[in-house]
Amino acid sequence: PNPVPHADVVTFTTHKTLRGPRGGCILSTEAIAKKIDSAVFPGNQGGPLEHVIAAKAIAFREAMDAGFADYARRIVDNARALADALADQGFRLVSGGTDNHLLLVDLRAFDEALTGKEAQEVLDQGGVTLNRNTIPDDPRSPFVTSGVRMGVASVTTQGMGTEEMTQIADFTARILRQRDDVAAVNAIAKEVAELCAHYPPYPDSTLK
């Protein structure tokens, strides 16, 4: 659904799923546009960088292409596949699944003693990047948490599909089950690296 016709103000980032450079946009009705401009510039914004503006223009142009719609559909397919695969491994999805690029996972069903902080740290060692996240009625502090948040935009851009989501769920579960075994985590990290080697982020780059 498109919020623009219904909301007075719409904000979004130009990075993340839009795949542009770091930044953001504010869309508004004409009635409050000048107030927003005055609030943003020059107090909170200044020194525009032309190369970043150019990169945003490219991102917007790509978003207008039919291929971007296909990319968005593949993101949702991958997110749902990852959600199903994680559920098969014993994790609980807070919302029972997902309709977008994000998954919020309650770790307690998988391991009551496991915290989001610990999961984030050991998964990072194993080559799986995510972040700790609070869940509804979380008994732990926001710095510790009982959940983690996962996204699939990056791996989808790199060309991974639903089969790879099953592998990612498997890596995640195995790392967490063996989190006290450094050698086992390092061995799984090599498997993760082998998978990623088939999907380089910049396949046409000549830089090594």
Describe the predicted segments one by one.
Residues 142-208:
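PLP-dependent enzyme catalytic core of the Aspartate aminotransferase-like
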Residues 47-50, 67-74, 86-97, 179-189, ...:
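Flexible, glycine/charged-enriched surface loops at secondary-structure junctions
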Residues 1-90, 152:
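Conserved PLP-enzyme active-site core in the AAT-like
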Residues 57, 74-80, 96-106, 136-141, ...:
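A glycine-rich phosphate-binding loop feature that marks nucleotide/adenosyl-phosphate handling sites
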Residues 81, 85-89, 118-126, 169-171, ...:
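Generic non-transmembrane alpha-helical segments
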Residues 33-38, 57-64, 97-104, 145-152, ...:
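Short acidic (Asp/Glu) and glycine-rich catalytic loops that position anionic groups and cofactors
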Residues 92-159:
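Conserved PLP-binding catalytic core of the aspartate aminotransferase-like
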